[in-house]
Amino acid sequence: MQIIHDFIRGGFIMSYTAQYQKAVFDVLNSVFTTEAEKIDRAGAALCSSFQKGGLLYVFGCGHSHMISEELFYRAGGLAAVYPIFETSTMLHEGAAKSSRIERMSGYAELVMERYPIGENDCFLVVSTSGINSFTIEMAQAAKRRGAYVIGISSGAYLSKPSRQKDGLHLPDVCDLAIDNHVPAGDAIVQVCADGTKAGPVSSIASMAIANSIVLSACEKLSESGTEPVVYHSGNCEGGDKLNEAIIAEYQKRIRCL
């Protein structure tokens, strides 16, 4: 998507925050307009998985791991979500180290061996660049186990060289690839004279896509006569009690509950 960089409106230059807000709206509008059919297909796949007793596994490296947290154990979130929190690829145990590990080949299979993902499950993998070995090989490992693989990445990186040994990009190995319409480099507001930008948009875009997939699945479940199992807010009256029943049902299948 071509994001408009002419931020002069009404004879004055828009502030950085106004530029950012406009760019966020532009990205989300592009996503919801262009990717609607794919989001609907992802929702259908997820609905089918749940009807067969499957789970939604979610994975991302670095900041993309936040999408796993976004969908897991939260008010309004589906119960049948199994996040893959691989701490070596998260920032709290060494940010620079996580970047190096994300580019490693051969580690993904060791991670996937710890999870009982199978043919009734869906696997949502998020990587805006979609060029690093770990994420691509996680998607491949999930496919080998029979899961339906949904990828979220940016089409802006398809022209960039992949770091994966076979030159693959994330969309190449997914059953369904959804474009988050994030520009290469992620940040969108120029803040330095040399062209350096701030204000990343990938987390907002990818979370919006992920929650849209969830809502699509909920709608399809409801239409088929099955009420989706959704967590309640523990900060509202009665929420804890309702959630206790959900946890009791799923904690044997989802270790991190």
Regions found by a protein language model. Give the residues of each.
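YjeF_N-associated NAD(P)HX repair module
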Residues: 192-257
